[in-house]
Curated annotation (Swiss-Prot):
Places the protein is found: Secreted
Domain of life of the source: Eukaryota
Covalent S-S links between cysteines: C33-C40, C87-C203, C220-C228
Source organism of this protein record: Isoodon macrourus (Short-nosed bandicoot)
GO MF annotation terms: hormone activity; prolactin receptor binding
CDD domains named among the record's database cross-references: prolactin_like
Protein name: Prolactin
Signal sequence residues: 1-29
Gene3D superfamilies per UniProt: 1.20.1250.10
Length: 228
């Protein structure tokens, strides 16, 4: 029976990795200007297609990574009750649902997406570094953390291009929410350290879901004139 379970678990893991790889290749195949190009023009529609696919990919990976960490490290520890409303991005005023988001002007919503993405640059870098040092950390968690860090940078770059097309010449100051959670990720106390990881992954899943929803709304509004 144990052998069958191990075999099934291995098959599911392989399927998950293959699915992630295929989606990653789909994302990378979308049109984008080559690095260093000067006169390359990508339509706003294509930029949004890529941004929406990237945001969905990041949210999928974030959810998988959180669920895997939760199952392996957080069972019976009561972390979820402590994680509510303790994200470093809580200082940014973000709409909680589609109805609230629809009330926000597209320029403000675009800038909000930029701020949230920038707020994750440093935490994602340290997440990768600290997961590497975790004893017996599943390799799949590290791979997902590395992939999310890379794709978040690509999404931020794409969003800057979108803002540049929607509002040419209007460059927003690089405002973002400062993260101060590194000491907690390095604590000697296991419970404190594991909760810090849990909370960070919980917040990443939450914010990636918000960004995914905001971008779908913005694409509908700016590309399809809200007819979707």
């Amino acid at each position: 029976m144990c052998t069958k379970r191990s075999s099934l678990k291995g098959s599911l893991l392989l399927l998950l990795l293959i699915s992630s790889l295929l989606l990653s290749r789909s994302v990378d195949s979308l049109p984008i200007c080559p690095s260093g190009s000067v006169n390359c023009q990508v339509s706003l529609s294509d930029l949004f297609d890529r941004a929406v696919m990237l945001s969905h990919y990041i949210h999928s990976l974030s959810s998988e990574m959180f669920n895997e960490f939760d199952e392996r490290y957080a069972q019976g520890r009561g972390f979820i009750t402590k994680a509510i409303n303790s994200c470093h991005t809580s200082s940014l005023s973000t709409p909680e649902d589609k109805g609230q988001a629809q009330q926000i002007h597209h320029e403000a919503l675009l800038n909000l997406v930029l701020r949230v993405l920038r707020s994750w640059n440093e935490p994602l870098y340290h997440l990768v570094t600290e997961v590497r040092s975790m004893q017996e950390a599943p390799h799949t968690i590290l791979l997902k953390a590395m992939e999310i860090e890379e794709q978040n940078k690509k999404l931020l770059e794409g969003m800057e291009k979108i803002v540049g097309q929607v509002h040419p010449g209007d460059r927003e100051n690089e405002v973002y929410s400062v993260w101060s959670g590194l000491p907690s990720l390095q604590m000697a106390d296991e419970d404190t350290r594991l909760f810090a990881f849990y909370n960070l992954l919980h917040c990443l899943r939450r914010d990636s879901h918000k960004i995914d929803n905001y971008l779908k709304l913005l694409k509908c509004r700016l590309i399809h004139d809200s007819n979707c």
